[in-house]
Amino acid sequence: MTIKSDKWIRRMAQETGMIEPFEPGQVRQSNGQKIVSYGTSSYGYDIRCADEFKIFTNINSTIVDPKNFDENSFVDVKSDVCIIPPNSFALARTIEYFRIPRNVLTICLGKSTYARCGIIVNVTPFEPEWEGYVTLEFSNTTPLPAKIYAGEGCAQVLFFESDEVCEVSYKDRGGKYQGQHGVTLPKA
């Protein structure tokens, strides 16, 4: 597997709609203000967080069970910022919609700007032929509230092209998160 360059990312986004909307360069300012960067980088693509959040709450004193997840464990927020309570987390989604080619696997890593503040972004790989909006998980590891900015960069996607095409893709398997829209909760 080889990591793909900015040139390949631009070509695939423009020719196949691999990333929509797509920013061919690196955006570091908006309306004259510094922002957490997004867009195409040398060997990756910095994704943005949309303005839809699900903030974890323990008001129902429930057990967190990935096989039987209680939707009441979250408070829905639509805003240009998300305040995550201390030692808690929030779910969000990307602005970008992805269509991953059959011979490509991605790895998504959090941006250091957030990590240096104790905010960890977790996203699993995007498998071959997966498509949809990416559900993001932000963990606030600090004892203080933490702020996430919608419309700004939050993680970087690295694209790896295989030397041969997989026999069975995510789409072929009927993956449970295929074509997801909005912030998607766990599915067993």
UniProtKB/Swiss-Prot annotation:
Binding, dCTP: K111, S112, T113, Y114, A115, R116, T135, L136, E137, Q156, Y170, Q180
Superkingdom per UniProt: Bacteria
Coiled coil: none
Pfam families, alphabetized: DCD (PF22769)
Protein name: dCTP deaminase
Subunit description: Homotrimer.
Functional note: Catalyzes the deamination of dCTP to dUTP.
Keywords from the UniProt entry: Hydrolase, Nucleotide metabolism, Nucleotide-binding
Residue positions of the active site: E137
Family: Belongs to the dCTP deaminase family.
Entry's Gene Ontology BP terms: dUMP biosynthetic process; dUTP biosynthetic process; nucleobase-containing small molecule interconversion
EC number: 3.5.4.13
Gene Ontology molecular function terms on file: dCTP deaminase activity; nucleotide binding
Organism: Herminiimonas arsenicoxydans
Gene3D superfamilies per UniProt: 2.70.40.10
Lineage: Bacteria, Pseudomonadati, Pseudomonadota, Betaproteobacteria, Burkholderiales
Catalytic activity: dCTP + H2O + H(+) = dUTP + NH4(+)
InterPro entries associated with the record: dCTP_deaminase, dUTPase-like_sf, dUTPase_trimeric
Pathway(s) served: Pyrimidine metabolism; dUMP biosynthesis; dUMP from dCTP (dUTP route): step 1/2
